Amino acid sequence: MRTSSMMENQVSLSSIQRAVWDGKLPLQITLASSESRTYDQTDPYLIACPRISYLPSLLPRLRAFFSPSLIEPNSQPHEGWFSFEGVPLKWHLPVGLLYDLYAGADPASKGTRVDETDHPTSSLNDTLPWRLTVHFSDWPDEELVRLDADGMVMHDAFINSVKEADFLRNGTAKGIMTLSKEDSAGLWQAVQDVDLLSFQRISNILLPPPNQPFRNVPIRFFLPLSPDSGSPSLKVVQSPLPPNIPATTNTSQSTNLRHSPATQVQTLGSALHSLLPNLFPSRRTPVLAKPVLHGAAVPMSAPIEELVRSCAYGDGWVYIVIRMMG
């Protein structure tokens, strides 16, 4: 029975992962008016962009699309960068995370599709399509690392993030370090191509088997700060989070303590209560803020290891945006 239950759980996690990889965002990308021969009259570029992908992957086609309108005809695709309402967007963060951080509407609840391109609800109408601006000059060096023509800067940033996640899961980065050059390149290519089967073939080498728990769970929490805080607009909270924690004992129960479990599953609620107790005074119910992942509000009861196995981005991390309530 236990084996059957584990298999059913794996099927469920696999279906969630497929839904995550199928998720897309409609983007409306406009050339910066200062770089356009027609100022603000250039037609925008429209695309349904995979949530797990990265904005720089769009630069070659955007450079070709806007080529007739560019004042500077010699600009190169890798010189492109994106902004939203004047804010340069970090190119090393996935598209879905960037949207949830800067423009996300009220998160979808249980039962809502991950794909925002399908019949968006009224709560999404004001934010979709997500309107971005692409620039091919005036690179913001103080905020963004420059890209290169061969794409190695982007590749290396991705692989470094994979290494961090691998180290947290296993207590060592031996897995990613011993990947062949072909598999290392293939992992990044699978994310670019949104090829889940090719991705799973390689990423499963790095994951502990389902019956072996992670050492720690690679999760980062993003907290928005008020504009007048004098700090960057985002704060990232990260701490080693084991998938299991010491079990809490209910003294009112008359159970034999010798038969009580030594540990219990770490849920998202227990992790948030531990890291951010002022925002999450309850382990079970969102009171002041709610966690958002892939555009959806995440149940506080979700085991954090299962979140990573089913909902991680391509680099192995779960990126959760904390959205204030009310």
From Swiss-Prot:
Post-translational modification: Conjugated to atg12; which is essential for autophagy.
Subcellular locations according to the entry: Preautophagosomal structure membrane
InterPro entries (alphabetical): Atg5, ATG5_HBR, Atg5_HR, ATG5_UblA, Atg5_UblA_dom_sf, ATG5_UblB
Covalent cross-link Glycyl lysine isopeptide (Lys-Gly) (interchain with G-Cter in atg12) as placed by the record, residue numbers: 163
Subunit structure: Conjugated with atg12.
Role noted for this protein: Involved in cytoplasm to vacuole transport (Cvt) and autophagic vesicle formation. Autophagy is essential for maintenance of amino acid levels and protein synthesis under nitrogen starvation. Required for selective autophagic degradation of the nucleus (nucleophagy). Also required for mitophagy, which eliminates defective or superfluous mitochondria in order to fulfill cellular energy requirements and prevent excess ROS production.
Family: Belongs to the ATG5 family.
Protein name: Autophagy protein 5
Native organism: Aspergillus fumigatus (strain ATCC MYA-4609 / CBS 101355 / FGSC A1100 / Af293) (Neosartorya fumigata)
